[in-house]
Amino acid sequence: MDKLELVNDGLNIIDFIQKNQKEIQKTYGRSSIQQPSIKDQTKAWEDFLQCTSGESEQVEGGMSKDDGDVERRNLEDLSSTSPTDGTIGKRVSNTRDWAEGSDDIQLDPVVTDVVYHDHGGECTGYGFTSSPERGWSDYTSGANNGNVCLVSDAKMLSYAPEIAVSKEDRETDLVHLENKLSTTGLNPTAVPFTLRNLSDPAKDSPVIAEHYYGLGVKEQNVGPQTSRNVNLDSIKLYTSDDEEADQLEFEDEFAGSSSEVIVGISPEDEEPSSVGGKPNESIGRTIEGQSIRDNLQAKDNKSTDVPGAGPKDSAVKEEPPQKRLPMLAEEFECSGSEDPIIRELLKENSLINCQQGKDAQPPYHWSIERSISPDKTEIVNGAVQTADRQRPGTPMPKSRGIPIKKGHRREISICWDGKRAWVEEWCNPACSRITPLPRRQECQCGECPTECFHCG
């Protein structure tokens, strides 16, 4: 179509609009645009269905029987010719009448689903067959108990792909099977699942070596009832207000019972002690039927049981020495440990326990007495009395090796009362303890200045 024809068509359209201007404005005007009525829509659909289906009977509310101008076609007369073998097939309906066959009434509902199989054989309820035909198989439930059967009037489909796989290839040849799985979109390298009884462990299970701190390497295949040493690292101590509710639980999976505690038993402890000598008791013995706190308090009443806890003229320490860990909530005693932190705490605790007299001073005041002048003795005594009352600003012990700083430190706190926020600043002595409370502390060493250049 050239440009001249396009121009002529445009002119014809303009002439048509000018001649029918009133009719067009009445029908398609902006004020008259609306959908057709339901009656017009229904009649249009009936006309369309009557033309496509070719029915001669009158539809309710539609065309009449006498209207013979419409082309009539029957679906049952349609036929298709296969381009491959020239066979002519007949289109059949994929639905079945109710109560088809000799049965009068079928109580169970019949669900029919037509499925096309491309495996080269008929899919029946008893496995694959060697039939060369492919066809339509419908899965039925109710009448045929869910078995897969082949429709009797199934025909060859011309558009179906041909995949010729013999029975031997399907059963034995894995290469053909993988190729077939690849063409169908399945995973050809899938590993089949094998059932395995997990309740029976393997006889040759590997032995997993676990290392217990201070005890060396233990093997996992040791019997659960065998007694063994348990380190403090594998023990959790839970305390409460009720003494009878105290429990000692183990993280050690080989512990026989939650009421047995076996810690650091030496060969000397396993031998029975003599009647006349000192009883060689240890926390490593079995505790049953009583709370651990009562048992430990009974041992504290005997000065000979815990060396270093009695007066200065007590007997010679036993070997191995029993030591008390001050970091535990309960006074839990155990044999020696190689942890450097525990040894440092034990060293500090032993120095404090050596000064049991009334006139004795804590070790962290010795350096203060040596460094101050005689005129500050009263201040030092006041500091000592403050330390005896265990005030919160007690400086750190000398055994830690951290020097005590003299002076002031500036502290800043952001306060909030629910309506406004403000910042407060003040100075505290450097020897006082840092606390989250926004308040001023007192000097604990007696050598910090009363004011600094920040205080003004």
From Swiss-Prot:
Protein family according to the UniProt entry: Belongs to the paramyxoviruses V protein family.
Role summary: Plays an essential role in the inhibition of host immune response. Prevents the establishment of cellular antiviral state by blocking interferon-alpha/beta (IFN-alpha/beta) production and signaling pathway. Interacts with host IFIH1/MDA5 and DHX58/LGP2 to inhibit the transduction pathway involved in the activation of IFN-beta promoter, thus protecting the virus against cell antiviral state. Blocks the type I interferon signaling pathway by interacting with host STAT1 and STAT2 and thereby inhibiting their phosphorylation and subsequent nuclear translocation.
PTM-bearing positions, type Phosphoserine: S257, S350
Residue positions binding Zn(2+) 1: H408, C427, C452, C455
Broad class of where this protein is predominantly found: host cell
GO molecular function, one term: metal ion binding
A GO cellular-component term linked to this record: host cell cytoplasm
Residues the record lists as binding Zn(2+) 2: C431, C443, C445, C448
Name by which UniProt lists this protein: Non-structural protein V
Lineage, highest ranks first: Viruses, Riboviria, Orthornavirae, Negarnaviricota, Haploviricotina
Compositionally biased region (Basic and acidic residues): 63-76
Keyword annotations of the record: Host cytoplasm, Host-virus interaction, Inhibition of host innate immune response by virus, Inhibition of host interferon signaling pathway by virus, Inhibition of host MDA5 by virus, Inhibition of host RLR pathway by virus, Inhibition of host STAT1 by virus, Inhibition of host STAT2 by virus, Interferon antiviral system evasion, Metal-binding, Phosphoprotein, Viral immunoevasion, Zinc
Gene behind the chain: P/V/C
Organism: Nipah virus
Note: The P/V/C gene has two overlapping open reading frames. One encodes the P/V/W proteins and the other the C protein.
Self-association state and partner proteins as the record states: Interacts with host IFIH1/MDA5, DHX58/LGP2, STAT1 and STAT2. Interacts (via N-terminus) with host UBXN1 (via C-terminal UBX domain); this interaction inhibits interferon-alpha/beta (IFN-alpha/beta) production. Interacts with host RIGI regulatory protein (via CARDs domain) and host TRIM25 (via SPRY domain); these interactions prevent TRIM25-mediated ubiquitination of RIG-I and disrupts downstream RIG-I signaling.
Compartments (UniProt record): Host cytoplasm
Entry's Gene Ontology BP terms: protein stabilization; symbiont-mediated suppression of host cytoplasmic pattern recognition receptor signaling pathway via inhibition of MDA-5 activity; symbiont-mediated suppression of host JAK-STAT cascade via inhibition of STAT1 activity; symbiont-mediated suppression of host JAK-STAT cascade via inhibition of STAT2 activity; symbiont-mediated suppression of host receptor-mediated signal transduction; symbiont-mediated suppression of host type I interferon-mediated signaling pathway
Residue ranges, annotated region (Disordered): 53-92, 265-324
Record note on what altering S274R does: In strain: Isolate NV/MY/99/VRI-0626
